[in-house]
Amino acid sequence: MSKAHPPEVKKYMDKRMMLKLNGGRAVTGILRGFDPFMNVVLDDTVEECKDNTKNNIGMVVIRGNSIVMVEALDRV
């Protein structure tokens, strides 16, 4: 099994991020933590549904293998 390398996302800590997830889902929130497998903790998270509604879901942990794309919404 290959060893995971830590993702270089330290500079994005405490910044607002948008994550596209598998299954066409998308969330935005403030990055509070991550690990070498790109599992992330987001705070003040908002889920953007396909019918253009938004659900506030608070603090969440998202598994790295479900993340398709990451975009910084704040200046780094």
UniProtKB/Swiss-Prot annotation:
A single BP term in Gene Ontology: mRNA splicing, via spliceosome
Subcellular location as annotated: Cytoplasm, Cytosol; Nucleus
Pfam families registered for this protein in UniProt: LSM (PF01423)
Organism superkingdom: Eukaryota
Keyword flag Ion transport: no
MF term (GO), any: RNA binding
Transmembrane domains' residue ranges: none
Keywords: Cytoplasm, mRNA processing, mRNA splicing, Nucleus, Ribonucleoprotein, RNA-binding, Spliceosome
Quaternary state and interactors: Interacts with the SMN complex. Core component of the spliceosomal U1, U2, U4 and U5 small nuclear ribonucleoproteins (snRNPs), the building blocks of the spliceosome. Most spliceosomal snRNPs contain a common set of Sm proteins, SNRPB, SNRPD1, SNRPD2, SNRPD3, SNRPE, SNRPF and SNRPG that assemble in a heptameric protein ring on the Sm site of the small nuclear RNA to form the core snRNP. Component of the U1 snRNP. Component of the U4/U6-U5 tri-snRNP complex. Component of the U7 snRNP complex. Component of the U11/U12 snRNPs that are part of the U12-type spliceosome.
PANTHER family in the cross-refs: SMALL NUCLEAR RIBONUCLEOPROTEIN (PTHR10553), SMALL NUCLEAR RIBONUCLEOPROTEIN G (PTHR10553:SF2)
Function according to Swiss-Prot or TrEMBL: Plays a role in pre-mRNA splicing as a core component of the spliceosomal U1, U2, U4 and U5 small nuclear ribonucleoproteins (snRNPs), the building blocks of the spliceosome. Component of both the pre-catalytic spliceosome B complex and activated spliceosome C complexes. Is also a component of the minor U12 spliceosome.
Name of the protein in question: Probable small nuclear ribonucleoprotein G
Lineage: Eukaryota, Metazoa, Ecdysozoa, Arthropoda, Hexapoda
Gene: SNRPG
